Regions:
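Short acidic amphipathic segments
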Residues: 143-158
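Helix N-cap motif at beta-to-alpha junctions
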Residues: 136-143
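Loop-rich non-cytosolic ectodomains and luminal regions
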Residues: 1-130, 134, 157-161
């Protein structure tokens, strides 16, 4: 069943996870908190270098943003691991070339330097996309249905007012 979820942001594993003594993965390690929206909705015309950043914005693969009939379905595209991988790699490459973004992140001592973003790209190209969590906004009934799916290990909620 398709769930009624608002935009879903997926957290992607971009480096090897540290394991504790019993081989249990330590999700509190210093893995960068980075990912992508897997059901995007775009309402503006954006242009980018499609050769340099293929599939940067799924569903908006044409430069002619005025013709909605030519847009791909972003949710369908991102169901394919190869499309999701290409999209995420393009996002990381795009970020690694944004000098203002990198300067801002550097001041915050983040994991988002050009070198670290390129290392993330290498990891994704070698290991593929591994989503380890996601965030969304949904009502109680939707989350209860979602919690019954076998792929869902745990749900953490906060009330939004």
């Amino acid at each position: 069943d398709k769930q009624d979820l608002a935009e879903v942001w997926c957290a992607v594993q971009v480096a090897e996870l540290e394991k504790e003594e019993e081989g249990v993965v330590n999700f509190q390690s210093n893995i960068p908190n980075i990912g992508f929206v897997c059901n995007p909705s775009y309402n503006t015309a954006i242009k980018w270098d499609e050769k340099k950043y293929p599939n940067l914005l799924p569903g908006c693969e044409t430069q002619d943003m005025g013709n909605e009939d030519e847009w791909d379905d972003p949710e369908e595209n991102l169901k394919s691991e190869s499309n999701a991988r290409q999209h995420f790699v393009s996002l990381l490459n795009y970020l690694s070339n944004q000098k203002k973004f990198l300067a801002m992140m550097e001041k915050d001592n983040s994991n988002y330097t050009t070198k670290e973003l390129k290392e993330m790209v290498s990891y994704i190209k070698k290991n593929g996309i591994k989503v380890y969590g996601f965030t969304t906004i949904a009502d109680k009934e939707t989350l209860l249905k979602l919690s019954k799916q076998s792929e869902v290990y745990e749900i953490y909620t906060e009330e939004v007012r």
